[in-house]
Amino acid sequence: FMMSGYFVGYFIGAATIPMIISQVGHIRVFAAFASLASLVILIHSIIISPFVWFLLRVLTGLSMVCIYTVAESWLNDRSSNKNRGSVLSIYMVILYGSLGIGMFFLNFSTPKNFQPFILVSVITSAALIPILLTKKKPPTFKSIKAMKLRELYNASPFGMVSSLFYGTIQSALFTLLAVYASSMNFSILELSLIHI
């Protein structure tokens, strides 16, 4: 139940982020939602309640989709047709590599302590520094027109269906793998390893 909140926020963010970016720009959106993510992470360590954590996960999902959208649209804008695939591939390797490596931090402190929450908040806050200090101009898009689901399906039926299946499988693994591993009495190290 709690982890599903992440994907509720993710869907809300995916529907609203283009409008927010068009109104205030990439840098402010990144700063605002990285700050929100950092704040929400710390609140997890203060309030222990399944309902509150569900709401915090909604805010985390919203924040992360906004951060991802800003990063990916910026990379997309800065790359050419010749190198776009390579640039986005490197980005995805770094993204998923970071998620996998992050799981090993569970081995250094118990989630019952404040330290893991503080560490994640510090890392999230540090992500603001290069974006806020960049001299590069953010992407500018003249107009953002959302595709309807029917248009998206007509443009790429295989892409849409495979993305739907991939998202469903990934979200199930992301939310339930730790629960399964815990029920099977996996150690923290084993749990970290299966998330790679």
Residue ranges and their predicted role:
Residues V58-V93:
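Cytoplasmic helix-loop-helix junction between adjacent transmembrane helices
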Residues F7-F11, A15, L99-G100:
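Residue-level signature of mid-helix packing/kink "hotspots" within the transmembrane helices
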Residues R28-L42:
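Structural signature of the two symmetry-related core transmembrane helices
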Residues I194-I196:
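Conserved small/polar residues in nucleotide/adenosyl-binding loops
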Residues G13-G25:
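Helix-to-loop junctions at the C-terminal end of transmembrane segments
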Residues F51-L59:
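Paired small-residue
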Residues S121-F141:
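C-terminal membrane-cytosol helix-exit motif in multi-pass small-molecule transporters
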Residues G25, I46-I48:
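Helix-breaking motifs and short loop linkers at transmembrane-helix boundaries and internal kinks
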